Amino acid sequence: IFTVGKYEERKNLFMMINVIRQLAGQYPVKLTIAGECSNQFQKDYYSRLKQNVKEAGLENRVRLLCNLTRTEMNAEYQKADLFVLPSTREPASISQLEAMAFSVPVVCSDTNGSACYVEEGHNGRLFQDNCEESLRETVETMLRSQDQLIQMGRNAYQDVKEKYQFNNYYEGIMECLNCLKK
């Protein structure tokens, strides 16, 4: 499982780690978190998160990465089977589209600004915002079937290719402008 975001409270990374702890006994689940860690608040949050991972005994299941280059980020997306964005009050996350472009299905909250990219059961799933139980159930549902993950990943890639590439946006805008001229 891969997640991306700044190391800050609203990203709900403690909740995500707790979900991994709950699922670790049933699934060979591992989590990689890649985040920005450039100011003191983020560094403090990162330190608390690292301590939490250690106290939970999850050092072999959770990796915390900081300030990755684009090449390093792409390598992490390529390794992922599932992308989870546990954030609350997320206006719009480009990381979901990035994951989908790498054929990785996505899980995000139902109030996420980019939840509109997720078609339930087609390219990912939604969970109830800020609800650990809902997040755990949603991730567990995704983990139950490798075939389902693969198919949702394929669907995610197709959706990005067909709906969210710049050329398609441009063509849609031009079509609208041409309609206005008439």
Predicted regions and their residues:
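Conserved donor-binding/catalytic core segment of Leloir-type glycosyltransferases
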Residues: 1-11, 17-20, 32
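Glycosyltransferase donor-sugar binding loop
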Residues: 30-50
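Nucleotide-activated donor-binding/catalytic signature segment of Leloir-type glycosyltransferases, i.e.
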Residues: 46-68
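Short alpha-helical donor nucleotide-sugar binding micro-motif in glycosyltransferases
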Residues: 67, 75-80
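Aromatic "clamp/platform" in nucleotide-sugar-dependent glycosyltransferases that forms part
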Residues: 88
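Short hydrophobic beta-strand element within catalytic cores of glycosyltransferases
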Residues: 105-108, 118
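Conserved acidic donor-binding segment of nucleotide-sugar-dependent glycosyltransferases
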Residues: 120-121, 125-132, 141-146
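A short, well-ordered alpha-helix in the C-terminal region of glycosyltransferases
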Residues: 134, 141, 148-163, 169-175
